[in-house]
Amino acid sequence: DRVRETLFNWLASLAGVGGGGLPGWHCIDAFAGTGALGLEAASRGAASVLLVEQESALVDQLLKLKTKLAAEAVRIERGNGVTALERTTANSMHAVFLDPPFESPALYEPSLRAAARAVHDDGAVYLEAPRLWNDEELAPLGLHLYRHLKAGAVHAHLLRKGPASAA
């Protein structure tokens, strides 16, 4: 879809690679759902992708899809996305994908805080949310808005580490 294509164009520009590739990148999709974002990163050359999902039925689907696609760079873990991010080595991820359930607003702040710790200084955090997150809200979490796109009811954010003045 258009949002996903835009996201991966944004990420490829950060990676400095033509053709939309993410070679050597380490990524985590903390609320994987169908795995679309993480699997797309793997298809674009990411070295490792961790898909984290709580619902066992979705985890089963992800495992089948990983096998079908022979996605060797992909690991799948059943669990809480925030907890997985908190366990991730600091500054180790080039891309952190956050698409928490829109009906769970309490997940956003802890997810963003954990993502800011996990993401590499040259990396990015992608957030899908039902509303725009501005720099005033993001700054205490250690992030700033780098790119934004609104598509229907979805606000797609690409966030970077540090204050907005570092953009």
Predicted regions and their residues:
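Class I S-adenosyl-L-methionine-dependent methyltransferase catalytic core
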Residues: 1-167
